[in-house]
Design a protein with these regions (language model features):
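Transmembrane alpha-helix signature in integral membrane proteins
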Residues: 1-17
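Short loop segments and helix-boundary regions at transmembrane helix junctions
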Residues: 12-41, 46-51, 201-202
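Short hydrophobic faces within alpha-helices
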Residues: 15, 32, 110-114, 180
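Membrane-helix interface segments
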Residues: 18-26, 54-55, 106, 118, ...
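Transmembrane alpha-helices
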Residues: 32, 86, 91-105, 116-147
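Membrane-interfacial helix termini and adjacent extracytoplasmic/periplasmic loops
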Residues: 42-85, 119, 155-159
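C-terminal transmembrane helix and the adjacent membrane-cytosol boundary/short C-terminal tail
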Residues: 97-108, 112, 181-210
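Glycine-rich helix-loop "coupling/hinge" segments at transmembrane-helix boundaries
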Residues: 149-177, 210
Length: 210
């Protein structure tokens, strides 16, 4: 969720502030992953992150690592995080963009005219108004991520499994249904707690998803 926020906030800001010609092109790039299935995108990450994949080839080419000491980026939690961040990133960008688009640019100009530096105007005037989008995007990404199954199962291997994969294992393999039910309860409790925290901090009535 934090990685999606760190990558999605600048992307949404560019979408909201760039000229229409460039923002439309960037929006197409954001929506492009939705034109392919989740399974295809996950399988593509397997090819990209494997030891003989594109990422390791580039790292060897620029001299960060040697050919004999390639990074292990797949079948572990690293691969799961990278693939899930890519898949979930649009769900963070779109709520943020919908909020940022409604913020008048005159607010920043007024802050600058009153003596605020660009950084201070952004932190004190612009960023607080984007909190509903941050909360909505974070809640959406968290709910989607906590129940993800396909991506960790294919990319994560044994060391990159999430709670949904553990529930499936105990339901289908070990037949420890009581543990699976307990894990499901933890899953539900986590979602409800985040929903409660969002309602207390921001207010569910202020949620803006689009």
């Amino acid at each position: 969720m934090l990685l999606c926020l760190l990558l999605g906030y600048p992307g949404a800001y560019l979408l909201a502030t760039l000229p229409l010609r460039y923002s439309n092109l960037l929006m197409i790039m954001v929506l492009l992953p939705f034109w392919t299935s989740l399974l295809v995108r996950t399988t593509a990450w397997i090819a990209i992150l494997q030891s003989q994949g594109v990422v390791n080839d580039v790292l060897v080419w620029i001299g960060i690592t040697g050919d004999e000491s390639r990074f292990s980026l797949i079948y572990n939690m690293t691969g799961t995080i990278i693939a899930m961040t890519h898949i979930l990133l649009p769900f963070m960008i779109l709520p943020l963009y919908s909020v940022m688009k409604t913020i008048p640019s005159s607010y920043m100009r007024a802050a600058r005219s009153l003596g605020a530096t660009p950084a201070r105007a952004f932190l004190k005037v612009y960023m607080p108004q984007t909190i509903p989008g941050v909360g909505a995007g974070g809640l959406l990404v968290f709910i989607l991520a906590i129940g993800y199954y396909i991506t960790p199962a294919l990319v994560g291997g044994q060391d990159g499994q999430l709670i949904s994969n553990m529930i499936a294992y105990h339901m289908q393999k070990s037949l420890n249904w009581s543990l699976a039910a307990a894990l499901g309860g933890i899953l539900l409790a986590g979602v409800l707690f985040l929903y409660w925290a969002y309602d207390r901090i921001i207010g569910i009535d202020n949620m803006k998803l689009g």
